[in-house]
Structure formats: C-alpha cells, structure tokens
Design a protein with these regions (language model features):
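Extended, low-hydrophobicity, polar/charged segments
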Residues: 1-159
C-alpha cells in the first residue's frame, strides 16, 4: 500500500496488528457498497458516527454500515438525556475527519466511544482508516490499546 493514513501510523506505533484495505473512492460510495466491494459481510464493516448531547458533550458511536443509530438507546448508553447527530459542517473542525472518512482512532480529541455490542462477536471488524478509500481490519480487543471504548445495544432493531 502506497499511502498510510494517520490511523495506520498510530496502529503501527502501538505495534497493533491490522490489515489495510483500499477501494476506489472516485465515486460516491456507501458503507454497504464498501462492504460489497471488499467482499465482506456488512455486519463486520462498521461506520463511525459523531454525536452531540444536550449537555454539549460529544460522543462517538460505531455501528455496522447497514444499521441505523437509535438515538434514545445511544443516549441511555452514555448516560445522557438526549443526543443528536453532529452536523456535517462541524465534523472536520471537531474530529479532523470528513464525512465518509471518519475513524474512531486518531480524532483531534478523545471522545467517549461506544461500539454496537455485536462487534465483539467477530474475530475482526473493519472501519475507516481515516481517509475515504481506506479501511482497517483488526480485532476489537486490540482497539482498547489505542482508545477506551465500551459496547452496548445502540442500533434500531429491525423486526
């Protein structure tokens, strides 16, 4: 791989094993399309969402690409009354990442991070490497060496 993202450099520095994946990002591509392009089960490919609580605090939630964040469950998981999605225009100044290239690793500031609980069921999961067109695949337990996180049921149940 010719380019390493900041996420990959952080993982290298901490000597954490990961596999880098790339995809053609020249056209708009959804998380579900990324999973298909990389021939991965979309349940194992995660997206990073940044929220703001009524208290003004920011929280990061990482959920499967086909799932939808349940704002009530997410708020409860972090002990807040309510949360909303961060506005797209606020993402880059707050995190250093753009929409579609946001990673739970390497944000400008460390925010409380919660993964959908099923993330622990897989040997490895994939998420953005901090740049559109780049993904990292790693064991979620190794992630604790980089960022503190917890898991909870934070997605809308599809019945």
């Amino acid at each position: 791989m010719e380019d390493k993202t900041n996420v990959m450099r952080i993982l290298d520095q901490k000597k954490i094993s990961y596999t880098a994946h790339t995809y053609d990002s020249s056209k708009a591509i959804s998380g579900t399309e990324v999973a298909a392009y990389l021939n991965q089960n979309p349940d194992r490919v995660f997206k990073t969402l940044v929220t703001v609580a009524k208290s003004g605090k920011n929280y990061v939630f990482v959920i499967p690409v086909e799932a939808e964040l349940d704002l009530k469950k997410a708020a409860k998981a972090v002990g807040e009354k309510s949360i909303d999605m961060l506005k797209s225009k606020d993402l880059l100044p707050l995190t250093g990442y753009i929409h579609g290239g946001c990673s739970p690793i390497g944000m400008k500031k460390l925010f409380p991070t919660t993964f959908q609980k099923e993330a622990e069921e897989y040997n490895t999961i994939m998420f953005s490497a901090g740049k559109i067109g780049y993904q990292v695949e790693m064991n979620i337990k190794d992630l604790a060496k980089v960022i503190p996180y917890k898991t909870a049921d934070i997605t809308i149940d599809n019945i």
